[in-house]
Amino acid sequence: MKTFSPTPKDINRQWFVVDAQDQVLGRLASQIAHRLRGKHKPEFAPHMDNGDFIVVVNCEKIKVTGNKLADKKYYRHSGWVGGLKTTILGDVLADKPSRALMAAVKGMLPKNRLGRAMLKKLKIYAGPEHPHTAQNPQPLTLPH
């Protein structure tokens, strides 16, 4: 019996829509990253992008546990001396809630070209509407 190695023609991608209302940020992000990577499929290969497309709606109603709204910090640097910028999670969720979920999922994917390609299959929207109805995304229920 030979070992099966998938090829690009073997990839069958589906579209799923996930409702993020009352979901915990980290738990939701780990399940989304799992699906984006394709680890739920029997033909998973770590060197290929065979994950599905995920559309997340109601991102503005996402939950966090503990004191993370005040304690968790996001850092970015301008490249200049003294150019370190710090933002807390509460401000990020108030300003652009999709950015917090995107950062959480990005941290759970590979840090290379393949991970960037996987992240392009994630579509996040703050409200309940999304423009991907033509792809006929199937509702995906994730445990709380």
Swiss-Prot record:
CDD domains, alphabetized: Ribosomal_L13
Listed InterPro entries: Ribosomal_uL13 (IPR005822), Ribosomal_uL13_bac-type (IPR005823), Ribosomal_uL13_CS (IPR023563), Ribosomal_uL13_sf (IPR036899)
GO biological process, one term: translation
Record bears the keyword Ribonucleoprotein: yes
Keyword Ribosomal protein (UniProt): yes
Keywords: Ribonucleoprotein, Ribosomal protein
Pfam families reported for this sequence: Ribosomal_L13
GO cellular-component term (any): cytosolic large ribosomal subunit
Domain of life (superkingdom): Bacteria
SUPFAM superfamilies assigned to the protein according to its UniProt record, in alphabetical order: Ribosomal protein L13
GO molecular function (one): mRNA binding
Subunit-level organization: Part of the 50S ribosomal subunit.
HAMAP family: Ribosomal_uL13 (MF_01366)
Described function: This protein is one of the early assembly proteins of the 50S ribosomal subunit, although it is not seen to bind rRNA by itself. It is important during the early stages of 50S assembly.
PANTHER family xrefs: LARGE RIBOSOMAL SUBUNIT PROTEIN UL13M, RIBOSOMAL PROTEIN L13
Family: Belongs to the universal ribosomal protein uL13 family.
Protein name (Swiss-Prot/TrEMBL): Large ribosomal subunit protein uL13
Gene: rplM
